[in-house]
Amino acid sequence: MFLTRISINHPVFATMMMVMILVLGLFSYGRLGVDHYPETDLPVVVVATTYTGASPESVESEISRPIEAALNTIGGIDTITSESYEGRSIVVVQFEVDVDSQDAAQEVRDRVARLETKFPDGVATPQVTRYKPEGQAILSVAVSSTSRTLPEITTLATRVINNRLSVISGVGQVSLIGSSERQVLVVVDPDRLGAYGLAVSTVIEAIRGENQDRAAGTLISGINQRIVTVEGRIANTSGFNRIIVAQRNGYPVYLSEVATILDTGAEVTSLANYQGQTTLGLHIVKVQGANTVEVASAVRREVSALNAELTKDNVQLTITRDNSRPIASQVSQVQRTLVEGGVLSVLIVFIFLNSWRSTVITGLTLPISVIGTFAAIYALGFTLNIMTLMALSLSIGILIDDAIVVRENITRHLQMGKDPVRAALDGTNEIGLAVLSTTLCIVAVFLPVAFMGGLIGRFFLQFGVTVAVAVVISLFVSFTLDPMLSSVWCDPQSQKTAKRGFFGQLIERFDQWFEGLASRYRSVIYFTFDYRKTTIAIVLGMFVVSLLLVPRIGTEFLPPPDQGEVSISLEANEGASLDYMAAKVGQIERALREFNYVSSTYSTINSGEMRGFNKALVAVQLVHSSQRRLKTAETLGPIRRRLSRIAGLEISVGQRSEVVGSIKPLQLSILGDGDEELRRISDHITSVLAAIPGATEIESSIEKLRPTLAVRVRREAASDLGVSIATIGDTLRSLVAGDAISVWNSPDGETHDVVVRLPAAGRENAAQLRNLPIATARMDDNGKPIMVLLDQVADVVESTAPAQITRKDLSRDIRISSNIEGRTLGDVVADLKAAMTKMDIPVGFRISFGGDAENLTESTAYALQSLAMAVIFIYIILASQFGSFIQPIAIIMTMPLSLMGVLLGLLFTGSTLNMFSMIGIMMLMGLVTKNAILLVDYSNLGVREGKSLRQSLADAGAVRLRPIVMTTLAMIFGMLPTALGLGEGGAQRAPMAHAIIGGLISSTLLSLVFVPVVLTYLDAFAGRVRRWVPSPTGSNASAQHDGSDKTKTPACALTSQDQLGTTIM
């Protein structure tokens, strides 16, 4: 091969090429970002619209539905979902993964902009944003103090802490949870307002008018000019008391006479608890593309510096959640398995070659290939994440394979008595085409994997490309560095007459035993030739029996990672207050502290995905895996059973998926129009699901009604008194919800809202609402507006309304979700689907699965498509190598043999069929062809030398047994550290190695006897077909086929000189 010849003739040039690869790789490694999973630009666009005061029904009909209809005509949409709350609409448009997210967002903006003129008055401009997975917090910090009030802590956090953290490189946003901003609160007295005949709007306008500076122009005198300003800004909070809001009987009415002015904190609308104590929570979000580990490390350093500075102020910052910790831990663990796998693989080489020089020559392939791959990872814009590092760790045994085969063949030629240069050239040339084919087969497998569709395709893109690049670099090193070193670095130990030390003699005895094994294997091949049908029947029987194991191996989308964190979502009845929810969260936290493996708890109410006073999320950090006997998944059951004893809450315990973002793996939607029928179907499915073993914590999003107070204006009475609906609405909003009507500039230069509102004790029940004074348009004899009570112009009725209305794909949507315990997701879904086939679903209604169940179905389909493409590509490569359409069939028939080992490996280790193990199976398809290629390639060489097919196959088995066993053991031992699943997250990666190792063992053992037998059948078949295919005159195909096994040239082992007529089979 020309690469080999150039390298041997120019050893310095070959060395410098390796140095260049190492330099580029090391330089790139230092600049690679570190993340858990590959960053994905998911084409998901969110349209958020505010319609203050509107009921969920109004929001649905006037906002959500028109937006859905307008967006539904955009091309490339996967699903449209909407949620209509009181005063707010959220429409989420999920596009197909191949759609550019920026283009999708712009298209949505254009469509929504055309609708704005058709929206009712009072609808705010819709906000169109792209969903970004990296928008999740990488760190959470609790700010606490034993002497400062919450408003003071909030001010400190806003002015100092937030600013210091926000300027850190890579930090995109710092959001506050449980904050209480300082404000000037004008607490109005409704009785005094009524007594003075003052509308709340009069008070508001007075404050706005008096608390402002007004520019009055400029005075110009010669060359000088001065700006004239009317200074009306209130200098301190006490100054608000002197604002005159009206004149009564010739006397001013001051604001202090109808309201109390408080310098206080805003009413808390969210809460954060750490270890049972109320704190101010800071959630830090990184910018897209930033190195998660580096950003988190910088934030930790800054937090330490802030703690040192704020100790004198009695303020403490504590990191409550650090999502970079499991990332750094798992990346470190994968790197360690990579090194361990490399050491084990090299050890296998030493045992078989019994030469430390040969081991070094072969082992150099590993660091060069791995480090060189870092350059490609950097050039392609990838990061060091679980996918890329796992690709390298699983490829360790594969990367050394080419070097093993090349070096072993060179050693064999050295033992023939050839000089090192000739042995390096001949040995590489003889095996080169087979090595090239095996590498191309692996690349052929991962090309389709790299371009799988769906969400999972985005994640495995980097895995597939990394494996493909790594094996190509290892092939290059095997064809250049290994032959060059073999030619210039003489290895006396490669000779059988070399003197050995103690360990060398032990290995030599092993070598002698292996030579005997190879000889016995030759006899086994001849034996199978005599019992070909029996051999085929036994192998096929074993394959069929192994398929019976499939039902015993569960299926799931992704195995849960053991990251040492449990997520608990809590939901109380609609209408529950923040205080009620805080008390319930306290109960949950106290119960969790009963478990000795719980390290800390961090709870948030009305924050993030759990929006609403009745919703909370508790993040439970477990002690390190070395300090507990149970895996994270095993702690869920005890925690679930303990928390179920706490009444008044719907509780869901699970592990949050970083891929799909949900806690509950089983989710389905019931779609259709007709609330009663939707409710009936939902109740039926919920009851069916509850009866299925393994389904737990079942929830339905069937419209939950929240208590409301409906103010129904009596129009005739209101009209007679001159009271408009707008007046009533504005008055109630200001008094009940509170209005930020102005801004106060404090002496320290900060600005704070001025808010008008009723006291908390004055807005607790309907009776207080009925007695609120409303100013009419009529005046009394003194010119004051006549005041009436709300009860005189409106009825205040206790009622209920849907808390939210959910829609999907233009239909009403009820979502049912469930956790899984004690069984796999696939088993539960299969039982549910079987039960649903017996259900009577009316026309116009349909059921669709979501969450992990949908991802599992979709990803399995994509994996099967990619597998089919991989088999086709492998056939193309093999047919091109062997110049035959028949021989590749024998090699491809070894692929199913690996499934026996896959199923047994998964069964014995307790692993499931999931996306990791499925990718392992695909990877296996490229690996199992390696052994058969080595056999067939050497067999064809014997045939071309005039040997019979049976003799050449027997010789090939005896000669190629050593490299076959070496490469197989190198791959197995290279993947062994990953298969053990040690460390955090190791259990999630292990199924891929379990599948590959099991498949390698079964395919190696069976293909050694199966491939030779199949080739004899295919040769006979090709011989019969050749009789019907015309051959050019003079072709060697015109030779008589006498049926003699010892003298014929097999039809399926055709040389490169054969013409089309003889090679078509």
Swiss-Prot record:
Q: Quick one: a GO cellular component term? A: plasma membrane
Q: Mind listing the UniProt keywords for this protein, alphabetically?
A: Nodulation, Plasmid, Signal
| Region named Disordered | 1032-1052
Q: Which GO terms describe its molecular function?
A: xenobiotic transmembrane transporter activity
Its domain of life reads Bacteria
Record keywords: Signal included? yes
Compositional bias annotation for Polar residues: 1032-1041
One Pfam family this sequence matches: ACR_tran
Where does the signal peptide begin and end? 1-33
Task: Check the record and name the InterPro entries matching this protein.
Answer: AcrB_DN_DC_subdom, Acrflvin-R
Membrane-spanning parts:
none
State what this protein does.
Involved in the production of Medicago-specific nodulation signal molecule.
What's this protein's family per the entry?
Belongs to the resistance-nodulation-cell division (RND) (TC 2.A.6) family.
The entry's protein name is: Nodulation protein NolG
Q: Taxonomic lineage per UniProt?
A: Bacteria, Pseudomonadati, Pseudomonadota, Alphaproteobacteria, Hyphomicrobiales
